[in-house]
A protein has these predicted regions:
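Short loop/turn motifs that connect adjacent beta-strands in outer-membrane beta-barrel proteins
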Residues: 1-5, 45-56, 70, 110-117, ...
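Transmembrane beta-barrel strands of outer-membrane/channel proteins
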Residues: 8-14, 57-65, 119-125, 167-173, ...
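Outer-membrane pore/translocation modules
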Residues: 56, 62-196, 200, 245-248
Length: 296
C-alpha cells in the first residue's frame, strides 16, 4: 500500500474470448466477445498510524463497453424433418453500461524490512443492470451482493528490494440472486403458491501472484498470474443446469508484466497480459490490463 494521500487508479481491461469450457462443449460456434472495462478507483490512505498499521479506504466504479458476435437463424426453415433447421447469419451487437460498484471501507497495511502485508474488506454492490429474463450476455451486473476479504503480501528477496514475490488472496462470499417465480407447496391448506426461487453462487477463492525484478530506476518487469476457483456448491437453479462433469467454476491465467513510475509527477503505471490456459464453466480467453495511477 502506498504512503498516505489521495490516489486515483485508472484500470483499463481488454478481454477477448470465444469459448466457455463446460457450457455444452469447448467452443461456441460463431460466438466471440470483446469487452473493454474502465474502472476508476479512488483511494485514500490516512496519515494515522496505530501500532505500525496504515489505514485506508477505496471505491471502484466499473464502466463496460462490449461487442459480441454471434449466429442467429433467419429465413424460412430449410428442412423440417426430423426437426426444423434454419440458415444462420453472423451479427455483431454492442452494449455500454455501469457494472457492479466495489466499496472498500477498510484497508490495513504493515511494512517491515523485507515484507509488506495488506488486508481489506470490501462489498460489491449490484448496481449493474441485471434481469433474470435477459440473455446472460445482456446483463452488466451479477444481480447479487458479495462480501470480499483480501489478504496479500510482498516478499523482497534482497536488501535493495530489486527482486520481489507478491501474493494476493481473495475470498468472495456471494449472497442470493433472485431467479424466477415458481409454483411451490406452501401448506396443506394451500397446496400451491407463488414463491421466488433463488440461486446462490458458491463462494469464490482467487489467488493472484507475481514475480518481479527491477531492471532500471523506476522500472520493473516480471511474470504474473491468477487462479480462481469456486469452493462451495451453487444452490438453486442455474441457467445452464449443473456444471459440466459436475466441476465447479475455475479459471487460470499467466503472462508478462512491466511497471514504471515517474515520481516527479506522482505517476505510475503497469501493463500486463494474461493468457487463460484453463477454465471450467467460465469464459477462457486473453486479458490485457493497463493501469495508470496518479497521487495527490
Amino acid at each position: 500500500m502506498p504512503p498516505s494521500g489521495f490516489y486515483i487508479d485508472d484500470y483499463n481491461s481488454f478481454y477477448f474470448y470465444n469459448k466457455v469450457p463446460g457450457f455444452g462443449g469447448q467452443r461456441q460456434s460463431g460466438f466471440e466477445q470483446f469487452s473493454y472495462t474502465q474502472t476508476p478507483r479512488l483511494m485514500w490512505i490516512t496519515p494515522w498510524h496505530i501500532l505500525a498499521t496504515d489505514f485506508g479506504a477505496a471505491v471502484r466504479i466499473p464502466l463496460v463497453e462490449r461487442l459480441y458476435t454471434h449466429s442467429i437463424p433467419y429465413g424460412p426453415p430449410i428442412s423440417t424433418f426430423p426437426f426444423p433447421t434454419y440458415n444462420h447469419k453472423t451479427v455483431t451487437d454492442s452494449q455500454f453500461g455501469l457494472s457492479d460498484i466495489q466499496v472498500e471501507p477498510l484497508i490495513l497495511a504493515w511494512h517491515l524490512k523485507r515484507f509488506d502485508f495488506v488486508t481489506s474488506y470490501s462489498l460489491w454492490i449490484p448496481t449493474g443492470d441485471w434481469n433474470h429474463n435477459n440473455y446472460i450476455f445482456d446483463n452488466f451486473g451479477q444481480g447479487y451482493w458479495t462480501h470480499s476479504i483480501e489478504f496479500g503480501m510482498t516478499w523482497y528477496l534482497d536488501s535493495e528490494k530489486t527482486w520481489a514475490i507478491s501474493l494476493l488472496n481473495h475470498y468472495d462470499i456471494n449472497t442470493k440472486q433472485y431467479s424466477t417465480l415458481v409454483n411451490v407447496p406452501v401448506s396443506p391448506s394451500h397446496p400451491l403458491g407463488i414463491a421466488s426461487e433463488d440461486t446462490t453462487l458458491g463462494d469464490i477463492y482467487t489467488l493472484e501472484w507475481a514475480v518481479s525484478k527491477t531492471i532500471a530506476k523506476g522500472v520493473d518487469v516480471g511474470v504474473t498470474g491468477y487462479y480462481q476457483q469456486q469452493v462451495t456448491d451453487t444452490e438453486g437453479p442455474t441457467l445452464n443446469g449443473p456444471t459440466w462433469k459436475n466441476e465447479k467454476i475455475h479459471v487460470a491465467g499467466i503472462g508478462p508484466e512491466i511497471k514504471g513510475e515517474y515520481t516527479k509527477w506522482g505517476l505510475s503505471g503497469s501493463l500486463r497480459y494474461a493468457y487463460e490456459f484453463s477454465a471450467m464453466d467460465h469464459p477462457q480467453g486473453h486479458l490485457i490490463t493497463l493501469t495508470v495511477t496518479k497521487s495527490f
